[in-house]
Structures are given as C-alpha cells and as structure tokens.
A protein has these predicted regions:
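Cysteine-nucleophile active-site neighborhood
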Residues: 16-19, 23-27, 31, 342-439, ...
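Short acidic-aromatic active-site loops that bind/stabilize oxyanions
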Residues: 109-120, 300, 354-358, 432, ...
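Flexible phosphate-sensing "switch/lid" loops adjacent to ATP/NTP-binding sites
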Residues: 1-326, 333-349, 356-357, 364-370, ...
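Active-site proximal loops enriched in glycine and acidic residues that flank catalytic Cys/His/Asp
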Residues: 10, 40, 214, 296-299, ...
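A generic structural signal for well-ordered coil/turn residues at beta-strand boundaries
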Residues: 2, 206, 233, 290, ...
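C-terminal and late-domain segments of enzyme folds
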Residues: 434, 443-543
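Short beta-alpha connecting loops at secondary-structure transitions
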Residues: 56-64, 243-248, 352, 373-379, ...
Length: 543
C-alpha cells in the first residue's frame, strides 16, 4: 500500500513547536501499530546545517548514515524511536544545488529552469521517495519556517501539488499557529490565526486541522470562532497549551482526538489507541522527587539548544535512576576566568560536550583536572575526551605543552591530532568523519561494564583523534584505552584508572538515547553521580 502523507505548516511566528508536534503525531500513529517516517523541509539556502553556528541553529543532529541535519530530527527519533537517515532532511540549498548541477550537465536539454515545475518537482520527488524507500504507512512532513516567508513558497506549492498527485484521501494538512494573549484585554486573539490560514488558503492549501499554541487555556468559544473563519470542524481546532514537559504533548493531542481525526480522514486501520506506556513514563517524570546536579561545561551554553540531545540524554538517564537532572550551564571561558573550584563545587557530575576551535578549551582542560582530582563523575563527549587526554598528558605525564593540534598546531606534544584521511580535506561542509561506526569495548574496563556488549555502534562527528604515537605511554600511566575500532587503530573511548567514573568517548552517544531506552553511558554516569548525594568522595563502582 502506498504511504499516506501528513503535512505540518506553521503560522504567525516561528519556534512555536512544529518539531515537537510532528514528533508527537508520529508517536500517536506508532502507538496505533502504524509504521512512520518523517522528513523536515528547511527553506534556508545552506545545503545542510553542518557549518552553521550553534548560536543560530542549535545542535547539528547526526544520523546513522552521516547526515548533518536539523535538531528536529532528534525530536523525531526520540519520540518515535526510529533511526532516520539524511533523507529525512531537505534544505532549499540542497534542492538548488541539485538543480544547478543538472543544468550544468545539460540534463534539461537547454530548457528554462523555473521554480515551478523544476524546484517543486525535486521537493515532491524527495518526499514521495522517502515513503517508497522506507515502505511505511505514513510520512509526516514538517515544513520549516512560517507561512508567508518568501523562501518557503516553493515548498508550500510542492505540498499543495502532492495532494493532487497522490489523491486527496492520502494527504492531511495540519496548521500550527499561535494565539497571542493581550493582558490589557485579558483575552486570546484569533485574528493572526485567521490571517495565517487565509494566506495558506490563498496558496491552495486548506488545513484539515489547526493546532492552537497558547500559554493559556483556550475556551471552546475561541475554537468555534476559528472553526467558523477558517472552515475547519471545531473538533479539529485543537488547543495545545504550553507544558513544562514536552513528552506530554503526544498525550495532549491524543486526548484531544487528533489521532482519531487523522485515522478517519486518511482511512487508516490500525490497533486500538494505546498510549499507556508513554503515559506511565510521563507520570514517572512528574513524580521524581530526588535530583542530581550536573555541570555541563561547554562553549555555547548561552543557547542551550546547542546541546539539546545531551540535555535529553541526561534526562532519560535520570528517569532510569529515579532522579530529576538539574543542569548547571557553565561556560568554559568562565572556568578559565573564575577557576573550577568556584564554578564546579556544587556539581554531582560533570559533562564536557563537543565543540570546535580554541575558544574556551583551556577551561575544559581545567574542568577535566578538577573532575580527576576531586573524583567527580565525568563524561566527555568528542572534544570532552580530547581535553581529558590533554589534561592527563600535561599533569600526569609532565608534558606541559601537550595539546590538540586543532587548538595549537605548533604544540610539541600533539596527543590529539588530525585523522590521516582528513589531512588533505579542504572543504568544511560534510567532510568530517560522520555517521555510525563500530566500537569494541575492551574486557575488564568501565566501558565494557557499562555497555555489557562486545560490539556497539555509535555516531561520530570529528576530524581529530588520539595520536597513537602517545598511546602506549598514556596507557602505561593509567589512562586506559577502553574502546577501539575493530582494527584496533582508532581509540574510541578512554577512561581513568581508579576513578569512580571518568570516561571520555570520541563519538556522540547522546544521539542514540531514547526516553524509554536511555543510553548506557549516560545511565552509568548518572548512577555514579547520584552517589555523591550521599557520600563525599565516592568509592569506585564495581565492574
């Protein structure tokens, strides 16, 4: 059976939760026994977000096949519990690059290249191809940006055409909009929603359902008014009130009847609705009484979405151990300025996530030293492993000028250096070591104790690695190479001997954590960190 398509657009303002809404719709459909895939359409002209600043875009989410994608794909994977590929993110830059390459080759035989049909055809082909290749029941499509954006027009035209291409019974349009509250009038205003839907209809798209984002309860009379002006049944005008826990959103939408509306409109048959497992998880989150404090020491903490998957992975692990996780967002430059004692003394555990460039790295090195000397649980991700190695080389081996060649190209002791295959790379976009690669934890190590598997696969995004020229001397001094590539040439994980939990990894385990299945590295980290609630200097965890 051919896939059905659900398109989610946004109106009035951006950043009102389309990604969470799409992920929630996917969760609802999966709970009814349907298979689901998702694609995010981004109208910006970057080919992918891989070279975009975290301050503008947030984190870059890496897929199993090495795609550098929008952070919303992380929401999709966590909510729906699927592994997506680079095919689940399409940007305008990628579309235009494809078309221009074809034109230069002469594929269009001298024809005039236009937004319609050439741009729209590429967009449609990518959407339909995803449904065909994944062989799913439903493809949910998020259209980035806001209705009315100039760069989004070809994408809206493409999703309009798809309804005619695949049949009206196979497409469902959802419009997510904001209901602003005027405190002076003490009421929610519907006019922006009316105008947004009017503009959408002018493009030939009539929404089948409207999700109304609001910080306040939405009265039934407001829903009736929107229904009347926007030609949508009142039952399909669904309030979506702001909640503290985004994992509640699937339950809210299901209770509001969105699942039944979609199933009926698309003539889908599945299992009876059953969100009990998800509801139990959300209830457990609400009932957490004890907490654990984790210091996240990074370069981009002013914009926490830069570490969105790390934050969620910590949250998942906290739930596993019946702890809410309170994150202290600490800028690594502040550690340089004020010292680790002032910045880290109240933390039960420390995470140093990934990053690029020299800014703030010395603060991360000092953070690793503090965690080692004070026996505070430490989890280093990508750059977090590298600064752990640099700190050890400087303070244990006495190589005072040891560094990464990324940070100091002239260091006499490059304990971290560029990978051999990266040495000749000149282009920045899409050229790192990307995607899932195998790792083999070493017997009788913390890594093996945590994973309890001989072979694992983790997602990578890096150019630099531990320098094997220093590997023997590092290991002989107590820095254990506890996870290796299958050929034994690449150090994937390192850990400090006789420390409760000081583990660094060259990959990004946060991308594979799920609320119902926390990543073992984060689970082990929180298990160690929560012991500091009862004890000062904790004993080593048994292997």
């Amino acid at each position: 059976m051919a896939a059905k398509y659900i398109f989610v657009t946004g109106g009035v303002v951006s950043s009102i939760g389309k990604g969470i809404s799409v992920a929630s719709i996917g969760r609802i459909l999966k709970s009814r026994g349907l298979s689901v895939s998702v694609i995010k359409l981004d109208p910006y002209l970057n080919v992918d977000p891989g070279t975009m600043s975290p301050y503008q875009h947030g984190e870059v989410f890496v897929t199993v096949d090495g795609g550098e994608t929008d952070l919303d794909l992380g929401h999709y994977e966590r909510f729906i519990d699927v592994d997506l590929t680079r095919s689940s993110n399409l940007t305008a830059g990628e579309v235009y690059l494809d078309i221009i390459a074809k034109e230069r080759r002469g594929d269009f035989l001298g024809g005039t290249i236009q937004a319609v049909p050439h741009v729209t055809n590429v967009i449609k082909q990518r959407i339909v191809k995803l449904g065909e290749e994944t062989n799913v029941d439903v493809v949910v499509v998020e259209v980035g940006g806001t209705v009315g954006d100039i760069e989004g027009l070809p994408f809206l035209e493409a999703i309009r055409q798809i309804r005619n291409d695949v049949g009206r019974d196979n497409v469902f349009y959802i419009h997510l909009t904001l209901l602003p509250y005027l405190s002076a009038a003490k009421e929610l205003k519907t006019k922006p929603t009316q105008h947004s839907v009017k503009e959408l209809r002018a493009m030939g798209i009539q929404p089948d359902a409207i999700l109304c984002r609001s910080d306040f309860d939405v009265p039934y009379a407001i829903r009736e008014k929107i229904s009347s002006f926007c030609d949508v049944p009142t039952k399909a005008v669904i309030p979506l009130t702001t909640v503290e826990n985004v994992y509640e959103v699937p339950l809210i939408l299901e209770d509001a009847g969105l699942g039944d509306i979609i199933m009926d409109a698309l003539h889908l048959t599945g299992q009876p609705r059953d969100m009990s497992e998800w509801a139990n998880m959300v209830t457990r989150m609400k009932e957490l009484r004890d907490s654990v404090t984790i210091a996240l020491v990074g370069k981009y903490v002013e914009y926490p979405d830069s570490y969105l998957s790390v934050r969620e992975a910590l949250r998942h692990a906290g739930l596993l151990h019946d702890r809410s996780v309170e994150i202290q967002w600490i800028h690594s430059e502040d550690v340089e300025k004020y010292g680790p004692d002032a910045m880290l003394s109240t933390a039960n555990g420390i995470v140093v996530p990934g990053g690029f460039g020299p800014r703030g790295v010395e603060g991360m090195v000092e953070t690793a030293r503090y965690a080692r000397e004070h026996r505070i649980p430490y989890l280093g991700l990508c750059l977090g492993l590298q600064v752990m190695v640099v700190e050890w080389a400087r303070n244990i081996l006495g190589l005072k000028d040891a560094n990464s060649s990324e940070i100091d190209p002239d260091t006499p002791h490059p304990v971290i250096h560029i990978m051999e295959e990266q040495g000749s790379v000149t282009s920045m976009g899409g050229t790192m070591r990307l995607g899932s690669y195998p790792c083999r934890p070493v017997e009788n190590t913390l890594a093996m104790a945590v994973y309890n598997e001989r072979d694992v696969s983790e997602r990578h995004r890096h150019r630099f690695e531990l320098n094997n020229a220093y590997r023997e001397v590092l290991e002989n001094s107590g820095l254990i190479m506890s996870g290796l590539s299958p050929d034994g040439l690449l150090v994937e994980t390192g850990e400090i001997k006789d420390h409760p939990y000081m583990l660094g990894v060259q990959f990004h385990p946060e991308f594979q954590s799920r609320p119902n299945r926390p990543h073992p590295l984060f689970g082990g980290f929180i298990a160690a960190a929560k012991l500091t609630l009862r004890e000062g200097e904790q004993p080593p965890l048994p292997l």
